[in-house]
């Protein structure tokens, strides 16, 4: 994997002990490697201010367990004997980081049996990062006075076994002069006994903290409550959405009703024209006792409809604003009249050429009294509508009542 690397670290005295044990035997030897594996992320900043993070996994080999004969925990096919493996690794199963083998007078290449055995050990020990240390001593001189020891650390990657760099530490290396920040894998017996004595108060049987277990229970309870609240919130949001849709529909209906009412009001205003206040006040002033002239609606039979009468006082008292009193001048072009009335007026002019019409105001002053005039007007108004039209068109009434543009 890019950005990751593996490094093996083997102390000098462990390598010396392995070599001493192998040289004191007459055959090949094998065993297990104990230690720990740790990862470290190294961040290096370049001149371009770009971070380069690299993860380095270090396999620290600290101990070894030898097997005093070959095929002690496996057979010739590379199959692992579980019972024999438990017997060899009784209490140190979790600290196993790999296994090793000494082969005399051979090449630095893993055999097919060793590859099968390594994969089976990965399965039984549940350790995919398991490594294999191969040591191959050989004699370089004929007198057997000089020996050569080659060693290599192998690790499977993507189905193939690759060599892993192995560093043998000693007192002459500058890297080992500093303080170690990681604790050693070997712990004190007294400390372990004290921890086992009081561990029941803080740890469960599986090694987990009791407080952590309680916190996990509280977290699960909070999650359940949160789920129930989320369901209620979702339901309320759906109800609010439905109510908003209903409100929008009601607003649309209200807007339509207001538009219809506004259109109907405009039609009513057009159908009912504005009342002529001056005419109404004039009729109430000059004909106060004639309810027929005060009514806005009259039937075909000249019957007064009482609800249609105008009983409102418009407070218009100026006489000049009620009617325009000017001297009547007859003009056929301005006011055409029927042929029968025109003939009557011509006969009247021939009969009495010396008579002259007087203004209405002078005739009103020459009358004996206002009460007599009102009674005579009331008698004339009580006749039928057809008689009123004929009398208004007669020469006698024209002589008595000169015409006014207002009426």
UniProtKB/Swiss-Prot annotation:
Signal sequence, start to end: none
Biased composition (Acidic residues): 388-399
Main localization, broad class: nucleus
Gene Ontology biological process terms, A to Z: chromatin organization; double-strand break repair; mitotic G2 DNA damage checkpoint signaling; mitotic G2/M transition checkpoint; positive regulation of DNA repair; regulation of DNA repair; response to ionizing radiation
Post-translational modification (record): Phosphorylation of Ser-404 of the pSXXF motif by ATM or ATR constitutes a specific recognition motif for the BRCT domain of BRCA1.
Region (Disordered), start-end ranges: 344-407
Top-level taxon: Eukaryota
Gene Ontology cellular component annotations, sorted alphabetically: BRCA1-A complex; nuclear body; nucleus
Residue ranges the record marks as coiled coil: 209-259
Short motif pSXXF motif, span: 404-407
The MPN domain, residue ranges: 7-155
GO-annotated molecular function: polyubiquitin modification-dependent protein binding
Modified positions (Phosphoserine) in chain numbering: 48, 384-385, 394, 404
Localization of this protein: Nucleus
Keyword annotations of the record: Chromatin regulator, Coiled coil, DNA damage, DNA repair, Nucleus, Phosphoprotein
Regions of compositional bias (Basic and acidic residues) in chain numbering: 347-366
Quaternary context: Component of the ARISC complex, at least composed of UIMC1/RAP80, ABRAXAS1, BRCC3/BRCC36, BABAM2 and BABAM1/NBA1. Component of the BRCA1-A complex, at least composed of the BRCA1, BARD1, UIMC1/RAP80, ABRAXAS1, BRCC3/BRCC36, BABAM2 and BABAM1/NBA1. In the complex, interacts directly with UIMC1/RAP80, BRCC3/BRCC36 and BABAM2. Homodimer. Interacts directly (when phosphorylated at Ser-404) with BRCA1. The phosphorylated homodimer can interact directly with two BRCA1 chains, giving rise to a heterotetramer. Binds polyubiquitin.
Cited function: Involved in DNA damage response and double-strand break (DSB) repair. Component of the BRCA1-A complex, acting as a central scaffold protein that assembles the various components of the complex and mediates the recruitment of BRCA1. The BRCA1-A complex specifically recognizes 'Lys-63'-linked ubiquitinated histones H2A and H2AX at DNA lesion sites, leading to target the BRCA1-BARD1 heterodimer to sites of DNA damage at DSBs. This complex also possesses deubiquitinase activity that specifically removes 'Lys-63'-linked ubiquitin on histones H2A and H2AX.
Assigned protein family: Belongs to the FAM175 family. Abraxas subfamily.
Official protein name in the record: BRCA1-A complex subunit Abraxas 1
Protein species of origin: Mus musculus
